[in-house]
């Protein structure tokens, strides 16, 4: 049937609109998740020289936004320095700073969703090493200068690492867990045994013999135990 000029004009405009949408639609879809689409800027390195005791604060950030940071508070000057890892190393800390432990004059920062543990100098805040290829690390516990345990989310293993060489040396299998449902969290040590709470969708404490790196006992507790401390 004959459409005339009006029909042809409408057909032409529809085709043109399709071309426009093809170009702007990816931009529109990207806007709600701008954090996932943006590129993280890198800064120039700054020099720090912390003196005396201080307080480190890990700022978790937003999951999947890669905006975790590290702050430092100096009690003597009552001054807070924010983003010290970023400023000292000219790179972002990563996605979800879960915890930090101090051992042998180094700060060990566990970055959960970046699958890494960073070791930093406590005075300059500069990175001196890192442990990579972790599943979803939560906490690190030092058994000795050459052995540490790293708990994981979504894994049925606790990783054994060598802090001197920054490498994975083995695994502790957690009974009754699957890779998709496994979860181990905080750790405390009493004598030769390390006790670890099993958090997400779990209800147990595990007892690990540090001489054999094996689970030797377990205790059923309430649902999702989040933390534990040692009564000295």
Stretches with model-predicted labels:
Residues 1-35:
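Sec-dependent bacterial lipoprotein signal peptides
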Residues 37-232:
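Predominantly soluble domains enriched in secretory-pathway, periplasmic, or organellar proteins
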């Amino acid at each position: 049937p004959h459409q005339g000029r009006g029909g042809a004009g409408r057909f032409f405009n529809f085709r043109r609109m399709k071309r426009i949408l093809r170009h702007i639609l990816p931009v529109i879809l990207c806007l709600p998740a701008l954090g996932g689409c943006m590129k993280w800027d890198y800064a120039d390195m700054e020099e720090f020289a912390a003196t005396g005791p201080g307080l480190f604060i890990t700022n978790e950030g937003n999951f999947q936004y890669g905006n975790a940071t590290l702050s430092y508070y100096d009690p003597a000057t009552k001054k807070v320095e924010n983003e010290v890892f970023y400023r000292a190393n000219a790179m972002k800390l990563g996605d979800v700073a879960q915890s930090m432990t101090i051992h042998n004059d180094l700060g060990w920062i566990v970055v959960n969703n970046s699958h890494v543990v960073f070791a930093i100098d406590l005075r300059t805040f500069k990175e001196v090493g890192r442990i990579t290829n972790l599943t979803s690390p939560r906490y690190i516990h030092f058994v000795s200068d050459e052995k540490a345990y790293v708990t994981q989310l979504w894994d049925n293993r606790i990783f054994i690492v060598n802090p001197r060489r920054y490498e994975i040396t083995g695994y502790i299998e957690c009974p009754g867990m699957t890779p998709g449902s496994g979860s181990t969290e905080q750790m405390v040590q009493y004598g030769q045994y390390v006790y670890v709470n099993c958090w997400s969708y779990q209800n147990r404490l595990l007892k690990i013999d540090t001489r054999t790196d094996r689970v030797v006992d377990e205790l059923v507790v309430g649902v999702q135990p989040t933390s534990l401390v040692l009564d000295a």
